[in-house]
């Protein structure tokens, strides 16, 4: 998908389809334009991108690698977007491994 904006103001990373859509709907309800993406690289015209990593059932190391790979396609330099990690309400998934990978990708150690 080739559209005008190549950098969102908010980026949400979810580990499954349901979580991605839940986050997207919540942000749309408060006035944001939202795109939900399932693969990278992605270019869209919404102010919010929600990325479904589909990593919930993966081994933690593989989930972290998936997050690192997804984030490598995003424009994080020069005024990076607000990055949000969507966490399952019952705490399923690779929360620690994915947050650590997101922090590294964003230059936070």
What are these regions (language model features)?
Residues 2-109:
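Non-transmembrane, aqueous-exposed alpha-helical and coiled segments at domain scale
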């Amino acid at each position: 998908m080739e559209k005008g904006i190549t950098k969102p103001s908010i980026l949400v990373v979810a580990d499954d389809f349901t979580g991605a859509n839940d986050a997207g709907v919540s942000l749309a309800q408060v006035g944001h334009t939202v795109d939900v993406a399932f693969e990278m690289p992605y270019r869209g015209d919404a102010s919010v991108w929600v990325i479904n990593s589909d990593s919930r059932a993966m081994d933690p190391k593989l989930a972290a690698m998936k997050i690192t790979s997804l984030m490598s396609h995003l424009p994080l330099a020069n005024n990076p977007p607000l990055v949000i990690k969507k966490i399952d309400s019952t705490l399923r998934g690779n929360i620690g491994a994915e947050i650590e990978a997101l922090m590294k990708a964003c230059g936070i150690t």
